[in-house]
């Protein structure tokens, strides 16, 4: 199994923790370093482009898209969340490999921290497990 991870640089204190959770979980499941490709994009809105480029140009079986958007005082939050979500959904509907949705959308930094290794666990771990399961699913159909 080969994995691509596209991670947003924005809110990297959160996305970095999610990335570490995903990578550590993949390694716990026997995935070697050389089978994990990590690339960064500036923000969560760029996750779709990054995942699409990875899908087209890299030898991976699944992609994990990791980002974090925290609500502010303007509607920017809604546009970024909607755009990234629709983009990842489109890639899953039209692409040949699964793209796992690892976008954390919260009202506060504390809520994000809770989901990035805090009291609610690490959503990066869950994304890695989903990626493994989706590869197994695809491979089961191709046998």
UniProtKB/Swiss-Prot annotation:
- Which reaction(s) does its UniProt entry say it catalyses? (2S)-2-hydroxy-3-oxobutyl phosphate + 5-amino-6-(D-ribitylamino)uracil = 6,7-dimethyl-8-(1-D-ribityl)lumazine + phosphate + 2 H2O + H(+)
Active site per the UniProt annotation: 76
Involved pathway(s): Cofactor biosynthesis; riboflavin biosynthesis; riboflavin from 2-hydroxy-3-oxobutyl phosphate and 5-amino-6-(D-ribitylamino)uracil: step 1/2
Q: Where does 5-amino-6-(D-ribitylamino)uracil bind?
A: 10, 44-46, 68-70, 101
The protein's UniProt keywords, in alphabetical order, are: Riboflavin biosynthesis, Transferase
Task: Give me the Gene Ontology terms describing cellular component.
Answer: cytoplasm; cytosol; riboflavin synthase complex
Q: Name one GO molecular function term.
A: 6,7-dimethyl-8-ribityllumazine synthase activity
What Pfam families does the database record attribute to this sequence?
A: DMRL_synthase
Q: Which organism is it from?
A: Bacteroides thetaiotaomicron (strain ATCC 29148 / DSM 2079 / JCM 5827 / CCUG 10774 / NCTC 10582 / VPI-5482 / E50)
Query: What EC number(s) does the entry state?
Result: 2.5.1.78
Broadest EC class? transferase
Q: Where does (2S)-2-hydroxy-3-oxobutyl phosphate bind?
A: 73-74, 115
Function of the protein: Catalyzes the formation of 6,7-dimethyl-8-ribityllumazine by condensation of 5-amino-6-(D-ribitylamino)uracil with 3,4-dihydroxy-2-butanone 4-phosphate. This is the penultimate step in the biosynthesis of riboflavin.
| InterPro entries found in the cross-reference section | LS, LS/RS, LS/RS_sf
Gene Ontology biological process terms, A to Z? riboflavin biosynthetic process
The family note in this entry says: Belongs to the DMRL synthase family.
Q: Which domain of life is it from?
A: Bacteria
Q: What is the organism lineage in this UniProt record?
A: Bacteria, Pseudomonadati, Bacteroidota, Bacteroidia, Bacteroidales
> What is the name attached to this protein's record?
6,7-dimethyl-8-ribityllumazine synthase
